[in-house]
């Protein structure tokens, strides 16, 4: 979890309030977007009385993100208004839950990218063709395996201990507030275990599949352009849009993995600035990815627009 070493108390906390506002906005958008993804896919499951692989992954992904962003919202509020939160049993529970849900989110997004890559990409290799035929059988097992790995890795954080130095304080002249210093012990072995067990496998899978998918789409686009007769081709435009979306997903995923590593390993906790930046960056990926999923899916997009119109109508009647 985002664990900056400095937690402050004073009468007016403009920086704290600004950080809380930004994180709360990101988490609220993410929870609403993930809720829409979950609701639409759940309704589809009930109506069809069957669940596809994509629907199953999206349901798991949206549920994990709703839980994750709810914990982020609770944690950031508690850290600002109640320092004792970090010495409580509740903190350890929320810390383990935060890491577990973050790992699950990374794995589910990576498996979604892997599934789309296998279904969409076109490579003339026997092993790839065999994978295409068996991917639907393998995915449920891979999903359960990812949950098990996430849970096992997150248990490492259940024994996380803080060394609190109440006598030390730092003064920040720019923001004009006093900060109590909380030091978290960490070492290279812990950071290596954290990265290798929870972040590196899904990160490698996502980067590899997204990059190969972009390569496959670009190659197919070039072939269509060479054989195209008209000035505009809807298929080419669709491929270019898919390349842009996948590139955006890839950037957000790498950014989130880096922020998660820095957050849970306490590497940047000595810096107030970077601690705040990490806290603001962490909710960006789950919220941004969920919004992009909605924009790229006609059914989800219709539900999103309907919700926006309902909110706009409510605000008009209210004010």
From Swiss-Prot:
Q: Which InterPro entries match?
A: GPCR_Rhodpsn_7TM, TAS2R
SUPFAM superfamilies from the UniProt entry: Family A G protein-coupled receptor-like
Name the Gene Ontology molecular function terms of this record.
Answer: bitter taste receptor activity; G protein-coupled receptor activity; taste receptor activity
Subcellular localization is given as: Membrane
GO annotations of cellular component type:
membrane
Topological domain ranges for the Extracellular compartment = 1-16, 87-97, 159-194, 269-273
The record describes the protein's role as:
Putative taste receptor which may play a role in the perception of bitterness.
Q: Does the keyword Glycoprotein apply?
A: yes
Q: Which UniProt keywords apply?
A: G-protein coupled receptor, Glycoprotein, Membrane, Receptor, Sensory transduction, Taste, Transducer, Transmembrane, Transmembrane helix
Sugar attachment sites are: 95, 167, 176, 190
The UniProt record's further free-text remark is: Several bitter taste receptors are expressed in a single taste receptor cell.
Q: What is this protein called?
A: Taste receptor type 2 member 39
Domain of life (superkingdom): Eukaryota
| Pfam families in the cross-refs | TAS2R (PF05296)
Q: Which gene encodes it?
A: Tas2r39
The source organism is Mus musculus (Mouse)
How would you describe this protein's topology in the membrane?
A: Multi-pass membrane protein
Residues that span the membrane, as ranges: 17-37, 66-86, 98-118, 138-158, 195-215, 248-268, 274-294
